[in-house]
Regions:
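Generic hydrophobic, amphipathic alpha-helix propensity
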Residues: 21-29, 46-47, 71-83, 146
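Arg/Lys-rich, glycine/proline-spaced intrinsically disordered segments
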Residues: 7-11
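C-terminal peripheral helix-coil segments that are non-catalytic and often amphipathic
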Residues: 1-6, 143-159, 177-221
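Helix-turn-helix
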Residues: 24, 32-70
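Amphipathic alpha-helical packing segments from all-alpha helical-bundle domains
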Residues: 80, 128-170, 194
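Hydrophobic alpha-helical connector segments
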Residues: 70, 84-113
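Amphipathic alpha-helical segments used for helix-helix packing
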Residues: 99-102, 110-133, 147, 166-169, ...
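Hydrophobic/aromatic residues within well-ordered alpha-helical segments
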Residues: 64, 75, 79, 100-103, ...
Length: 221
């Protein structure tokens, strides 16, 4: 559980991005979790990185797990909200292939453009704990929307390959590892989305799909 209370005043000027001390704590934790590891990071080191007392941190987050939960939730909330909107709001208006491409491109862009590469935390042993059930459920729902759209996209081509959506989901999440290795470019999210559609049998229509996908992103984001 987290607290939105103001906490105690700091003894130095803010040195991190964020409108509030809570935002600065999240930014510091994200940096430390992704650079030195979750297990190796203490709440004291997070507080030191923000420039506040450890006791002040506890006004905002009771435990380190609370911080991790908030960060993990943030990695899927935007992509899931967009996928829900596209899956429901554009049904019957845009082709399934275009909707899958838009979801993949939007999701991949979020993963690649976030300040810290938080996706590398997905497979921490700690995340298997039931306290992270909300994050795990949201990620599973997002994966299910990929599958739904992928099945529809493949079905339109006469293919029976409903796994295209799941493969697209995995291609998008592979951007996390590519980013960790310094191999992500500005084109990487588009390349992942394109590859997913090709695997769904929609390669010949890719130019039209890209155009409709861009329109969906402009409309629903």
């Amino acid at each position: 559980m987290t607290s939105a209370g103001p906490g105690r005043p700091r003894h130095q000027q803010p040195s991190r991005p964020g409108a509030t001390a809570r935002d600065e704590i999240l930014d510091a934790a994200a940096e430390l979790f992704t650079t030195q590891g979750y297990a190796s990071t203490s709440t004291r080191s997070i507080a030191d990185a923000v420039g506040i007392r450890q006791s002040s941190l506890y006004h905002h987050f009771k435990t380190k797990d609370d911080i991790l939960e908030d960060l993990l939730d943030g990695t899927v909330s935007g992509g899931l909200a967009f996928a829900r909107a596209v899956a429901a709001g554009a049904e019957g208006e845009a082709a399934p292939g275009s909707r899958l491409h838009a979801v993949a491109l939007y999701d991949g862009t979020q993963l690649c453009s976030a300040r810290w590469n938080l996706g590398i935390l997905y497979h921490l042993p700690e995340v298997r704990n039931e306290r992270f059930a909300r994050f795990l459920a949201d990620r599973q729902e997002l994966r299910g929307l990929y599958r739904q759209l992928g099945g529809s996209a493949a079905g339109e081509t006469g293919m029976q390959e409903a796994g295209g959506g799941d493969v697209t989901f995995r291609l998008v999440e592979s951007l996390i590892s590519l980013r960790a290795d310094g191999l992500v470019t500005g084109d990487s999210p588009l390349q992942a989305a394109d590859a997913g559609l090709i695997l769904c049998g929609r390669g010949p229509e890719l130019s039209a799909i890209r155009a409709e996908s861009a329109a969906l992103i402009a409309r629903f984001s």
